[in-house]
Amino acid sequence: MRVLIAGLMASVFAIAGVSAAQAADRVDQVPEAPVAQEAPVKPAGSWEGFYLGGAGTYNMGDFGSDRHTYGFGGQVFTGYNWQQGQIVYGVESDLGYSGDDVSSGGVENKYGWNGSVRGRVGYDMNPFLLYGTAGLAIGDVKVSDDTSDESKTNFGYTVGAGVEAFVTNNITTRLEYRYTDYQSKDYDLDSGSFSRGYDENSVKLGIGVKF
């Protein structure tokens, strides 16, 4: 009888030992919780990405000899930058209005809405960006006399350079100079036919927001 009881107790301890070992294995095999992968974040001060803004402009224009004009205007701009190391490049467009006008010989010449599509290439000197820009320009030139007027859309080119700086991680300010030259066109008025082009030197002070 004692031999039987001893055998039963040995069997119980053996089963308990096997169960404990299996439980330990199951604990060891509990999968680890997945680690959340953070989305890549652009470093602070990066110029890469979409942006938009606005600028005030001071324009010094010329409709031809003795037809010089000076005035203020404004524009909105938007664009996208890519950045590789310290080289920044991208595309930018703007749309603006300028009330530049001058009268000569009974004929008034006026430069109105205008815009451009340009490329930009710059060098990052964080927090400053020095850049150059060039592209296609489009603008409205209106010529009128006492009894008639005619407006035409003129195309040309624009080139310039500027400096832009971070105010915060997503707010920038810029100072830019541009020269724009439009083609000449003929305007037929009651007082005669007139050929007019327009070229302009402008200084632009603006503020932008990066996204």
UniProtKB/Swiss-Prot annotation:
UniProt keyword annotations, A-Z: Cell outer membrane, Membrane, Signal
Domain of life of the source: Bacteria
Alphabetized InterPro entries for the sequence: OMP-like (IPR051692), OMP/PagP_b-brl (IPR011250), OMP_b-brl (IPR027385)
Signal peptide: 1-23
UniProt keyword Membrane, yes or no: yes
Localization: Cell outer membrane
Keyword Phosphoprotein attached: no
Residue stretches in coiled coil: none
Cellular compartments per GO CC: cell outer membrane
Pfam families noted in UniProt: OMP_b-brl
Family statement: Belongs to the Omp25/RopB family.
Protein's recorded name: 22 kDa outer membrane protein
Species of the source: Rhizobium leguminosarum bv. viciae
